[in-house]
Amino acid sequence: MTFKKILVGSALLLTTIFNNNVYAKDKKLELINVSYDPTRELYVEYNKLFTKYWKDKKGQDVVIQQSHGGSGKQARSVIDGLKADIVTLALAYDIDAIAEKASLLSPEWQKKLPHNSSPYTSTIVFLVKKGNPKHIKDWNDLVKTDVSVITPNPKTSGGARWNYLAAWAYALEHNNKDEEKAKEFIGKLYKNVKILDTGARGSTVTFTQRGIGDVLIAWENEALLSLHQPGGDKFEIVNPSLSVLAEPPVAVIDKNAAKKGTTEIAKAYLEQLYSKDAQEIIAKFYYRPSDLEVAKKYANTFPKIKLVDINYFGGWKQAQKKHFDDNGLFDQIYK
């Protein structure tokens, strides 16, 4: 299935599994999973696994609706009233914002599931044209004046914020932690960005389908998936010398689920992401599984890259305020 086919129609993907032997006493359950941009294929597959699991366990049919878009934009939709039962977003700050601004879940939500409520991780890499004609090897090559860079907008996209922070970390590490020099580096990089799509998938389409740009800064899973799409042989991946440990978290939106009577199934939906079968699906779609046995099985898929985590930037609250809030560093360098 191509990206174009996936993008046709509404951003709201309805995945429905029916069973002819429906118990009359059981009301069909409905869940809304509000997710970030490039998880579409992952959750199409996982939803099939989960609906079968729930049918076998409870004898109930489940309808799961998927909403995808830039993580920040998705979080705002939930804050503004989208009745999500669960969120599976790109970064913890976006779920923190739902807890803080709408009080729809506990501020301690991240302690409820293993690995800081992140059943999978990823990192940030470069996707370039086959043969790497611009000889892109590392972040410093992205600031050359003849290189056109594609990356989403960090104001709306979680992946874009990870992209930015990976570049910021590289700049700090290569300039003795001098923030003024890092700011100058980031300014040069974003001067080479001509299009800021609202989400990671939009940027992938801009680069792989529309043929715009010399390099795509991308989620590792998105870059690997691109290589396995029709036309994927036109591209190759470059792993930078330094990147970030991206931890996309998941959470039940407690107040919405309680009102809808879906708390039990919403919790089960997220808990099952840690099951062996789900972790296999996660690896199949090129996310780094949290289960150590499954991760070992797929070790050759994921190269070893030097990574820094969000604590390198002082945590998400500090990183968001410093870099991405109104009048933050991003607004200062990208006008």
Each model region followed by its residue ranges:
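A bilobed periplasmic-binding-protein/Venus flytrap-type ligand-binding module shared by bacterial periplasmic
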Residues: 124-132, 247-264, 281-285
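Extracellular/periplasmic juxtamembrane helices and adjacent flexible linkers that interface
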Residues: 257-335
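Bacterial N-terminal signal peptides that target proteins for export
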Residues: 1-8
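C-terminal segment of classical bacterial N-terminal signal peptides
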Residues: 15-23
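Short helix-loop capping/hinge motifs at secondary-structure junctions, enriched
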Residues: 131-137, 156, 169-177, 256-264
